[in-house]
From Swiss-Prot:
Name the record gives this protein: Iron-sulfur cluster assembly SufBD family protein SAB0778
Domain of life: Bacteria
InterPro entries (alphabetical): Fe-S_cluster_assembly_SufBD, SUF_FeS_clus_asmbl_SufB, SUF_FeS_clus_asmbl_SufBD_core, SUF_FeS_clus_asmbl_SufBD_sf, SufBD_N
Regions that span the bilayer: none
Family according to the record: Belongs to the iron-sulfur cluster assembly SufBD family.
Any single GO BP term: iron-sulfur cluster assembly
Length: 465
């Protein structure tokens, strides 16, 4: 008998487990909490200093005055560190039973066996499971949780950590820098190309929880890697905060693809800083799927520093009742003959709000640079809204910039055509939406495309009538 595929759609039901943590910090953000986190991790002195300086920056920096409403986000109500187990296990059988049951529901063991070169699973503040194929280690590839990389690869770690996203970048980058825990660290040596993805899962289980993973990826000259992350959390009446930082360095002739499929519950603030430095003839691809959350503010950024560097963002955002998806991309052209592409697909229903917010910058040295932007929004009812807010900065006259934006509704003609062939209105609307997101799903590995379609179908429930 065929085994049932892991159903990421189960996230929709917001299951959560009993608290199995072995340590939980007090609520609120203080210097003592920051010191406690660093002490529990047995970190070097320079990292504690970095955290404390970041905390001071966080206190000084203002809240963003644009994007979604953050007035209900209470930093004193959040638990900043929860340790779910003693250590990250390399055998699935050794993961604590309660935690293992959660990830079993999400299909992680089966996904690892079938599709992946390496897997990391983070539960609350810490990675609880981590494994990588032995042959990849033999090639010199490093794939660890970020805390382990700090301890075991300190020189390499220190060279790149906070070099792309400094603590002073924005208030939530400063917050992450003060209390970061977990995340993935990847180093791919020169000319090594991974054919199968590395993957991480991030799960918030507790109420009023803050998750602050820090991911750092370095693709050395001529290297290639695809990293996939999935994110989920159960439904609570009070708010949780996910505030990650992702830093990526794409060296000469290297290629990185970073795929995100998030399905946070609608009580989660998802406030993330993602940025990459791309050097000569390097290629960075962001593939970004944003479902769920109360508010998402996320703008994957490519800084194109070397001649011929390429950057692209392909994103989809789905906003339902009570949700705001404020997402987009930033492309910063700093070198000649660089190129960038932004394709943004947004869907809103039941009063949801989607906002595309993007920046394309052409510096004085970016002669011959070019950028293409496409923003398409599908609005499913009269209560939902969409805004497109592009911002372009041009400091030389030898560039090419194209921008196309389109807002549409499901047309009566489309529905009539499909319904005249015996298809119900609900099924017809679903088919139109699936066609709309197809440019996104076709870029996903097959198993993720299937799950993305399932998630969209769950989101589409009750969209008719």
């Amino acid at each position: 008998m065929a085994k049932k595929a892991p159903d990421v759609g189960d996230y929709k039901y917001g299951f959560h487990d009993d608290d199995v943590s072995i340590f939980r910090s007090e609520r609120g953000l203080t210097e003592n909490i920051v010191r406690e986190i660093s002490n529990m991790k047995n970190e070097p002195e320079w990292m504690l200093d970095f955290r404390l300086k970041s905390l001071k920056l966080f206190y000084k920096m203002p809240m963003p005055q644009w994007g979604g409403n953050l007035s209900e986000l209470n930093f004193d109500d959040i638990t900043y560190y929860v340790k779910p187990s003693e250590q990250a296990e390399r055998s699935w059988d050794e993961v604590p039973e309660e935690i293992k049951r959660t990830f079993d529901k999400l299909g992680i063991p089966e996904a690892e066996q079938k599709y992946l070169a390496g897997v990391s699973a983070q539960y609350e503040s810490e990675v609880v499971y981590h494994n990588m194929e032995k042959e990849l280690e033999e090639k010199g590839i490093i794939f660890k949780d970020t805390d382990s990389a700090l301890q075991e690869n300190e020189e390499l770690f220190k060279k790149y950590f906070a070099s792309v996203v400094p603590a002073a970048d924005n208030k939530f980058a400063a917050l992450n820098s003060a209390v970061w825990s977990g995340g993935s660290f990847i180093y791919v040596p020169k000319n090594i190309k991974l054919d199968t993805p590395l993957q991480a899962y991030f799960r918030i289980n507790s109420e009023n929880m803050g998750q602050f993973e820090r991911t750092l990826i370095i693709a050395d000259e001529g290297a290639s890697v695809h990293y996939v992350e999935g994110c989920t959390a159960p439904v609570y009446t009070t708010s949780s905060l996910h505030s990650a930082v992702v830093e990526i360095i794409v060296h000469k002739d290297a290629h990185v693809r970073y795929t995100t499929i998030q399905n946070w519950a609608n009580n989660v603030y998802n406030l993330v800083t993602k940025r990459t430095f791309v050097y000569e003839n390097g290629n960075m691809e962001w593939v970004d799927g944003n479902l769920g959350s109360k508010l998402t503010m996320k703008y994957p950024n490519c800084v194109l520093l070397g001649e011929g560097a390429k950057g692209s963002t392909l994103s989809i955002a789905f906003a339902g009742k009570g949700q705001v998806q404020d997402a987009g991309a930033k492309m910063i052209h700093k070198a000649p003959n660089t190129s960038s592409t932004i394709v943004s697909k947004s869907i809103s229903k039941n009063g949801g709000k989607v906002i595309y917010r993007g920046i394309v910058h052409f510096g004085r040295k970016a002669k011959g640079a070019r950028s293409n932007i496409e923003c398409d929004t599908l609005i499913l009812d009269n209560e939902s809204t969409s805004d497109t807010i592009p911002y372009n900065e041009v400091f030389n006259d030898q560039i090419s910039l194209e921008h196309e934006a389109k807002v549409s509704k499901v047309s009566e003609e489309q529905l009539f055509y499909l319904m005249s062939r015996g298809i119900s209105e609900e099924e017809a609307t679903e088919m139109i939406v699936m066609g709309f997101i197809e440019p996104f799903t076709k870029e996903l590995p097959m198993e993720y495309a299937v799950e993305m379609n399932r998630l969209i179908k769950f989101e589409m429930e009750d969209s008719i009538g």
